């Protein structure tokens, strides 16, 4: 009888310790999510021409090359979104999209405060460095507002 009671008590304590540990880890993980950040969306359709692929590639490269720390910390998030998919159609109206686009969005306290469609990516796609500089300047300006 004593062994059963001891086993039950130890089992309860072990179970309680596991629950407590998991709760601590989940709270710790939640603290690493920044409340203020910049999202860089590259919007495309299902059909993608070579220039569209290049726009996405340059956008991603410009952000990864210039903002490694911010990407790692979550201050910048890069997302590629197909607006032809039903779940993503709202972005066309949300950001007044009329073509393939790179849009940056400033989020504070979990709410979008402002956004900017970087329309000059089409103008600069033929000059990689100018493209990178343009994307860097625009994102850096948004980061200053965090």
Sequence positions of predicted segments:
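Bacterial N-terminal signal peptides
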Residues: 9-20
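Boundary at the C-terminal end of the N-terminal hydrophobic targeting segment
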Residues: 24-26
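Positively charged n-region of N-terminal signal peptides that target proteins for export
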Residues: 1-5
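Thiol-based oxidoreductase modules, predominantly thioredoxin-like and allied folds used
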Residues: 71-87
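Non-catalytic, surface beta->alpha helical segment in thiol-disulfide oxidoreductase systems
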Residues: 104-146
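Structural micro-motif
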Residues: 87, 92-107, 113
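Local sequence-structure signature of Cys/Sec-based thiol-disulfide redox active-site neighborhoods
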Residues: 33-65
């Amino acid at each position: 009888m004593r062994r059963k009671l001891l086993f039950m008590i130890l089992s309860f304590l072990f179970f309680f310790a596991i629950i407590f540990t998991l709760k601590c880890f989940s709270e710790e993980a939640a603290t690493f999510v920044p409340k203020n950040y910049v999202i860089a969306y590259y919007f495309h359709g299902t059909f993608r021409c070579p220039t569209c692929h290049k726009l996405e590639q340059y956008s991603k490269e410009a952000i990864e090359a210039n903002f490694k720390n911010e990407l790692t910390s979550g201050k910048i998030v890069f997302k590629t979104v197909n607006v032809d998919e039903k779940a993503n159609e709202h972005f066309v109206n949300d950001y007044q999209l009329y073509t393939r686009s790179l849009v940056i969005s400033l989020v504070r306290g979990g709410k979008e405060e402002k956004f900017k469609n970087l329309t000059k990516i089409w103008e600069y796609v033929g000059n990689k460095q100018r493209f990178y500089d343009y994307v860097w300047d625009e994102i850096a300006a948004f980061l200053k507002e965090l």
